[in-house]
Structures are given as C-alpha cells and as structure tokens.
Swiss-Prot record:
Residues 1-19 form the signal peptide. Pfam families: Enterotoxin_ST. Toxin which activates the particulate form of guanylate cyclase and increases cyclic GMP levels within the host intestinal epithelial cells. Could play an important role in pathogenesis. PROSITE patterns: ENTEROTOXIN_H_STABLE. InterPro entries: Heat-stable_enterotox_CS, Heat-stable_enterotox_STa. Disulfide bonds join 59-64, 60-68, 63-71. This is Heat-stable enterotoxin B. The gene is ystB. Keywords: Disulfide bond, Enterotoxin, Secreted, Signal, Toxin, Virulence. GO terms for cellular component: extracellular space. It comes from Yersinia enterocolitica.
Length: 71
C-alpha cells in the first residue's frame, strides 16, 4: 500500500512540475505585451514631474509610450 501511495505522490509531483515548465516555455508576445504596458504605465505614474516643469513629453521619454512617436 505504501508503494502505491508513493507512486501516486511522485506522479502528481512530476505532473505539476512538468506542467509549470511547459507553461513557462510557451509564453508568447501576446502575454508579454500587456505586461510590458503595465510596467510602463506604473513607471509613468511614479515618475510624474512637478506641475512647474514645462516638458509635455516626459512620459514618452521615460516610458517609450506606444501612443507617442516611439523611442
């Protein structure tokens, strides 16, 4: 009985490990683009200049905002 339980535990463990490796290998650009956009948005939110500064394109320069001409 102990051998059966051990075999089941090992099978479950290997299934979980292989499932995580397979998922991480199949990440494509469709998933990484929204993540990059979120990181850029957070960087823009944390680096807002003071209202006295006259640089209107600060977010484009800091974040490479896709709405701007680009970097």
């Amino acid at each position: 009985m102990k051998k059966i339980i051990l075999a089941l535990v090992l099978m479950l463990f290997s299934f979980c490990t292989l499932g995580q490796e397979t998922a991480s290998m199949h990440l494509d650009d469709t998933l990484s683009a929204p993540i990059a956009a979120e990181i850029n948005r957070k960087a823009c939110d944390t680096q807002t200049p003071s209202p006295s500064e006259e640089n209107d394109d600060w977010c484009c320069e800091v974040c490479c905002n896709p709405a701007c001409a680009g970097c």
